[in-house]
A protein has these predicted regions:
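Phosphate- and other anionic-substrate recognition elements at nucleic-acid/protein interfaces
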Residues: 1-180
Length: 180
């Protein structure tokens, strides 16, 4: 049986990118900030929980599946993150897991899996971020920041597994943006 529902992809962070739609469609997407820079984790958690309830626990917009990007492992970040950021990211994801429990199917994907799918190979963030944005624009997804672009790439990655018959149009082999 082919998947015919809607997928919500979340690049969970202080500024969370999201993408939503069914495989084969053009996703809707956006980004939202949870908390002020330097603000409390508790405030960010509360803002995240309110957003999930308001935007995604509504009958017309409920996803059939939610996929999120794994929080970055500190050793991979090469000292570019701190303990507060790690706690925030893990806390947001833990909240998401609890919120989805017995309500929504939840899946997880790593950054390297998504980049290999969407860009044809995994590469460092400084190279991958602008390429991901360019790839989204090439596909007609007018993203305005890297959070939205990462969420769209994650959405496309998950849709490929759900409906491989619809994935060829976004396969990196057909990308002009990736030919260099």
């Amino acid at each position: 049986v082919s998947f015919t529902g809607n997928v919500l992809a979340l690049d969970v962070a202080t500024v969370t990118g999201w993408a939503y739609g069914s495989p084969g469609s053009v996703p809707t997407f956006g980004s939202i900030r949870f908390g002020k820079p330097g603000g409390s984790r508790a405030a960010a958690y509360r803002a995240f929980s309110k957003w999930l309830e308001k935007e995604w626990n509504v009958r017309d917009a409920q996803p059939d599946l939610i996929v999120y990007e794994s929080p970055a492992v500190p050793s991979i970040m090469s000292g570019k993150t701190n303990i507060d950021t790690i706690r925030l990211l893990i806390g947001l994801v833990e909240y998401l897991e609890g919120w989805c429990y017995e309500n929504f199917e939840l899946r997880e994907a790593t950054v390297s899996q998504v980049r290999a799918h969407f860009l044809g190979r995994n590469m460092k963030s400084a190279i991958a971020k602008p390429m991901t944005m360019a790839r989204c624009v090439e596909l007609g997804w007018k993203v305005t920041n890297t959070d939205e672009a990462d969420a769209c790439a994650l959405w496309d990655y998950q849709c490929r597994f759900l409906r491989p018959d619809l994935a060829s149009k976004t396969a990196p082999i057909f990308s002009k943006a990736l030919i260099r």
